[in-house]
Amino acid sequence: MLHEPRFWSAVAFVLFFVLFGKKLWTPLAAALDSRADRIRADLDEAARLRREAEQMLEDATRERETAMVEARALVEHSLIEAARIADEARREAEAVATRREQMARDRIAASERSAVREVRQVAIDVAIQATRDVLATALPAGADHAIVDRAIADLPSALSHRAA
């Protein structure tokens, strides 16, 4: 056993750790503790980042749902507004068509009245001319004074009948 290299290696190993173990163990433990602290800090940071990401995901989901609700409401409002505008445009078009139709009827009525006046005036002119022609050919030369005198005499009674 004293001549075994394994025995002496084990003794050297134990002596090495007995003599230098405390001095070697402290920095080694400090390095391992420091690494463990860094890993723990990294894990804490990763957990914090995960919580932030989950919170951001919840916020984004909530905002998306809110935006969808607002978009639906906006589309619904737009459809209602479009229907209202179309209805208003239809009513305005009907009102314009009615006004134009009434204006056309008024123009037609005015044209009819004007045509009737013109026809009456032409009829009166023709009747007057025919009367002149008939009177000029049928009446003797002295009869015109007697007719005018009789018309002047009948004038007050004709005016009184007309006023009543």
UniProtKB/Swiss-Prot annotation:
Membrane topology label: Single-pass membrane protein
UniProt keyword terms in alphabetical order: ATP synthesis, Cell inner membrane, Cell membrane, CF(0), Hydrogen ion transport, Ion transport, Membrane, Transmembrane, Transmembrane helix, Transport
Name this polypeptide is given: ATP synthase subunit b
GO cellular component: plasma membrane; proton-transporting ATP synthase complex
Localization in the cell: Cell inner membrane
Keyword Transcription regulation: no
Recorded superkingdom: Bacteria
Subunit structure: F-type ATPases have 2 components, F(1) - the catalytic core - and F(0) - the membrane proton channel. F(1) has five subunits: alpha(3), beta(3), gamma(1), delta(1), epsilon(1). F(0) has three main subunits: a(1), b(2) and c(10-14). The alpha and beta chains form an alternating ring which encloses part of the gamma chain. F(1) is attached to F(0) by a central stalk formed by the gamma and epsilon chains, while a peripheral stalk is formed by the delta and b chains.
Protein function: F(1)F(0) ATP synthase produces ATP from ADP in the presence of a proton or sodium gradient. F-type ATPases consist of two structural domains, F(1) containing the extramembraneous catalytic core and F(0) containing the membrane proton channel, linked together by a central stalk and a peripheral stalk. During catalysis, ATP synthesis in the catalytic domain of F(1) is coupled via a rotary mechanism of the central stalk subunits to proton translocation.
Classification via Pfam families: ATP-synt_B
Sequence intervals crossing the membrane: 10-32
Entry similarity comment: Belongs to the ATPase B chain family.
Species of the source: Gluconacetobacter diazotrophicus (strain ATCC 49037 / DSM 5601 / CCUG 37298 / CIP 103539 / LMG 7603 / PAl5)
Primary localization: membrane
KW Coiled coil (keyword) present: no
HAMAP family: ATP_synth_b_bprime
GO molecular function, one term: proton-transporting ATP synthase activity, rotational mechanism
